[in-house]
């Protein structure tokens, strides 16, 4: 059997050691990082990877796409797919900054909690997402909308930037995502007034919602925070929290390590799917979400 090779592409200066470790621990034998990769480089790199091996060894060859930009990663996936010349085809898996698997795990954990605690699901729920301009928020918003929720991005620097992001989501996925201002405490409280679910995907170590702020969310069922660095992004959610009652007594909280556990397993199993598949796979956050739901239970 041919050796398993993973070509790891990133537009950044360095490939993430996190992703390198995950791929090796999942079983890939040879990893080659390519840094500073531009969108225009993807076709030539992809075709070099496919034409240097026999067609039957395409399933032993993978292209991983990293970086920190969800839309650029998706565009790179599209370029790689278009560069294939059947039967010369490889696996492709995108997970920029771990956001595809983190966002998938976050929404999967919320879905699990909604079912376990409230006998409901994401459909029709209003999901308000802080850190709205970030990659994890992007993925969570798209997954939520695709699952039938009403997702809203909150911009820490105003409404304009998140509105543009929401517009590109509609263009790319055909979904409607809301956008609101979250610059001041009163704006953040107004944003969560009708929230069934609150997600915090803001910067590490930054408090976004206080216990007092949560009083403005009388309908709140589940809140999740992926910030693992004190202070918590959402007050009262410990990093290890799994369906822990929130300080207001309204709803339950899910912490960063609970989400991280599902994220870790999801990313590991995505790599293993590539190694075990008999046909080439193209994997993104939608595939990650299906797997994360299975893992979360």
Curated annotation (Swiss-Prot):
BP terms from Gene Ontology: formaldehyde catabolic process; one-carbon metabolic process
Cellular compartment(s): Cytoplasm
Broad class of the protein's primary localization: cytoplasm
Temperature impact on function: Optimum temperature is 35-40 degrees Celsius.
InterPro entries with a match to the protein in the record: Aminoacid_DH-like_N_sf (IPR046346), Methyl-teptahyd_DH_N (IPR015259), Methyl-teptahyd_DH_N_sf (IPR037089), NAD(P)-bd_dom_sf (IPR036291), NAD-bd_H4MPT_DH (IPR035015)
Superkingdom in the source lineage: Bacteria
SUPFAM superfamilies: Aminoacid dehydrogenase-like, N-terminal domain (SSF53223), NAD(P)-binding Rossmann-fold domains (SSF51735)
Pathway(s) per entry: One-carbon metabolism; formaldehyde degradation; formate from formaldehyde (H(4)MPT route): step 2/5
Cysteine disulfide partners in this protein: none
The keyword tRNA processing belongs to this UniProt entry's keyword annotation: no
Family: To M.extorquens MtdA.
Description of how the protein assembles with itself and partners: Homohexamer.
Function: Catalyzes the dehydrogenation of methylene-H(4)MPT.
Record-given protein name: NAD(P)-dependent methylenetetrahydromethanopterin dehydrogenase
Taxonomic placement: Bacteria, Pseudomonadati, Pseudomonadota, Alphaproteobacteria, Hyphomicrobiales
Gene that encodes it: mtdB
């Amino acid at each position: 059997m041919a050796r398993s090779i993973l070509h790891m592409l990133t537009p950044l200066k360095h490939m993430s050691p996190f992703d390198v470790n995950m791929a090796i621990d999942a079983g890939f034998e040879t990893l080659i990082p390519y840094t500073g990769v531009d969108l225009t480089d993807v076709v030539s790199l992809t075709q070099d990877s496919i034409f240097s091996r026999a067609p039957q060894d395409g399933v032993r060859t993978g292209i991983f796409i990293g970086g920190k930009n969800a839309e650029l990663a998706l565009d790179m996936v599209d370029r790689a797919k278009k560069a294939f010349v059947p039967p010369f085809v490889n696996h492709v898996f995108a997970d920029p900054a771990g956001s595809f698997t983190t966002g998938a795990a976050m929404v999967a954990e919320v879905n699990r909690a909604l079912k376990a605690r409230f006998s409901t699901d994401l459909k029709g729920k209003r999901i308000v997402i802080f850190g709205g301009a970030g990659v994890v928020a992007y993925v969570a918003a798209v997954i939520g909308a695709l699952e039938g929720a009403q997702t809203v991005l909150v911009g820490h620097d105003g409404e304009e930037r998140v509105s543009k992001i929401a517009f590109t989501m509609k263009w790319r996925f055909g979904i409607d995502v809301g956008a609101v201002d979250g610059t001041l405490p009163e704006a953040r409280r107004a944003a969560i007034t009708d929230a069934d679910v609150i997600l915090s995907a803001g910067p590490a170590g930054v408090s976004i919602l206080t216990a007092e702020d949560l009083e403005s969310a009388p309908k709140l069922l589940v809140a999740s925070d992926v910030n693992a660095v004190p202070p918590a992004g959402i007050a009262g959610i410990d990093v290890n929290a799994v369906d822990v009652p929130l300080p207001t007594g309204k709803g339950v909280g899910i912490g960063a390590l609970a989400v991280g556990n599902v994220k870790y397993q999801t990313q590991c199993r995505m790599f293993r799917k590539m190694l075990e598949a008999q046909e080439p796979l193209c994997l993104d956050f939608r595939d990650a979400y299906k797997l994360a739901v299975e893992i979360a239970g």
